[in-house]
Amino acid sequence: MLRGSRSVGVYAVCSCRQFTCVSARLKPFDLGSLKTNNNQSETFNFESMNRFGDSSATSRPIKENRFAQKFEKSAPKKNNYPKRQEKHRNPRKAVRFQFESGSVQAQNAIKAVINEVHSYSKSYKVNYVGSGKGGLEQKHLVDIVNSLDLAVNGIYCVPPTDDKSLPIIKTNKVQEMIKSYTDKLALEKEQELLQKGSIVAQKVMRSRDRAEKKKSATKVSTVSWGISNSDLCNQKATEIQKRISKGEHFLLYLGEKKSFYSARQSASKENAFGLKDTPEVGDIAEEDLAGMSVEERKRLSIFQTVKTMLDDSSCQYEISGDLESRVLFSCQPLERDTKSKDTEQKEAKKSKKASASKQADNSKKAMSEDELDSLYSFKIED
């Protein structure tokens, strides 16, 4: 520690990032203040340098942490945003279709109609025809279906005209609903077989197309100028009545036999015969009849007989042509009142049932009287 005549004493103090250094420089040759005994030299106090010791803790108060309470708060945070109002949504109504009547096929058919309606209206709202009020009535399909008796009635769907409108529901007979359902299934199956390349399906389709063309073709009934009066009044008369009873449009062609083939071939073409409307055909004055030949008189007689047949039946017709070559009747049967016929048939059935019940009652009364007579005779004999 001491060398020569010069000595240096150093005293250092460190506390909390502060360093204090005090150096004392003694005067030269001032050895009086120094202790010559090495054994009696003072030890350095290291505890005084401990900033976090007990002495420092007791000497200087510790400042409180002003952020401690901020993070130790247990109260909920304040939300300055306004509270959202909870919207109470109405629960969706369960759609339940109930089929308590009808066969399994009828139930499958009405399920197909329900699926078709759902493809147009997801809410099952429809315009209903047949409520008795007249016009369209907006209803729910569940109310219509659940009120149906599938053993008697069915429904069918009419697609809407645009995306904003609702489908139309009409009632029909359950047999018609089942038939449309089975036809739809058959068509889907046929398309599936055609895609697979089935030869049988191709033959069936071709035969059906031929049948449809034949059905849609205009029917032609021919009458020859050389027909006898008996054949005209019997055979041709029944043929014409059958055509009228079917209610289909048909042509009645009067001409030579050799022109029948061309008449049938050109019947489907519009104005193929090239005949002008001549409603005055057959209106011949009596003074002109004397100058007519036998053939012309025969043709006039055939024409008048056919015209009388059409007049007596419920049929409208237009005449074109002339007696010299050919005459064409374009016939359109009138629509019959089917309701009146149905009511007549029902009334006839009711009258038959009433008469049968009366006969049964009369027979019972007669039997009871005979039994009483036999009892009385038995008692008299006793």
Swiss-Prot record:
InterPro entries registered for this protein in UniProt: AIM23
Compartment annotation: Mitochondrion
Biased composition (Basic and acidic residues): 64-75, 334-348
Keywords annotated in UniProt: Mitochondrion, Transit peptide
GO cellular component: mitochondrion
Domain of life: Eukaryota
Broad class of the protein's primary localization: mitochondrion
UniProt region (Disordered), positions on chain: 64-91, 334-370
Transit peptide feature, positions: 1-26
Family, similarity comment: Belongs to the AIM23 family.
Record's protein name: Altered inheritance of mitochondria protein 23, mitochondrial
Species this chain originates from: Meyerozyma guilliermondii (strain ATCC 6260 / CBS 566 / DSM 6381 / JCM 1539 / NBRC 10279 / NRRL Y-324)
Protein's gene: AIM23
